[in-house]
Each structure stands twice: as structure tokens, then as C-alpha cells.
Amino acid sequence: MTVTNTPTPTFDQLTRYIRVRSEPEAKFVEFDFAIGHPELFVELVLPQDAFVKFCQHNRVVAMDEAMAKAVDDDMVKWRFGDVGRRLPKDPG
């Protein structure tokens, strides 16, 4: 068995993700921001210009459709139980 020591990335090396929730022409940009793990995010709101600067400063990566779906599925699972189930299982 070979053991490899993979260095853990520092905080500054972690990927920063965004997912825009607002419409493109909205005055304020509503978006999710995550560091390292797309499923652990905060919801933020910034004016358009500030959002652009925020993204440049943080060197963000936009979540693709597959990432967004995985995050949404995970949210449903935690909120309602099994993925896709919105009601408790019938005991009888």
C-alpha cells in the first residue's frame, strides 16, 4: 500500500463559487457565495458594480448546471428527507 501525502490547500487556495439568483438586468445582484464547498454557501446581495469587483477580488468560479443541481438536490434532501420526497413516508 502506498501512502501519499497530498497537501491540504490553504484557505486562500480554496475555490470560491458563486451562483447568481437574480435576473441579469436587476439593480442588485442576489447570489450564493461558497468557499471550498459549493453546498455550504451564504446568500449575498450587492449592487452590480460591487458584484463585479467582488467577483474579481475573489477570483470566483460560477457554478455550472450540474453543481447547481447537486446543491439543490442536497437542499431538498436535508429539508424533506430522501431526495425528491416532500412528505414523510407512510407508516402503514
Swiss-Prot record:
Q: Which UniProt keywords apply?
A: Aromatic hydrocarbons catabolism, Plasmid
Question: What InterPro entries does the record tag this protein with?
Answer: DmpK
Q: In which pathway does it act?
A: Aromatic compound metabolism; phenol degradation
What if the gene is knocked out?
A: Cells lacking this gene cannot grow on phenol.
**GO molecular-function term, one example from the UniProt record:** phenol 2-monooxygenase activity
One biological process GO term for this chain? phenol-containing compound catabolic process
What does the record give as the function of this protein?
DmpK is an auxiliary protein associated with the multicomponent phenol hydroxylase DmpLMNOP and it may be involved in the post-translational incorporation of iron into the oxygenase component of the phenol hydroxylase. Required for growth on phenol but not for in vitro phenol hydroxylase activity.
On subunit structure and binding partners, the annotation says: Homotrimer or homotetramer. Interacts with the phenol hydroxylase components DmpL (P1 component) and DmpN (P3 component).
Q: What is this protein called?
A: Phenol 2-monooxygenase, auxiliary component DmpK
Q: Which organism is it from?
A: Pseudomonas sp. (strain CF600)
What are the top taxonomic ranks of the organism? Answer: Bacteria, Pseudomonadati, Pseudomonadota
What gene name is given for the protein in this entry?
Answer: dmpK
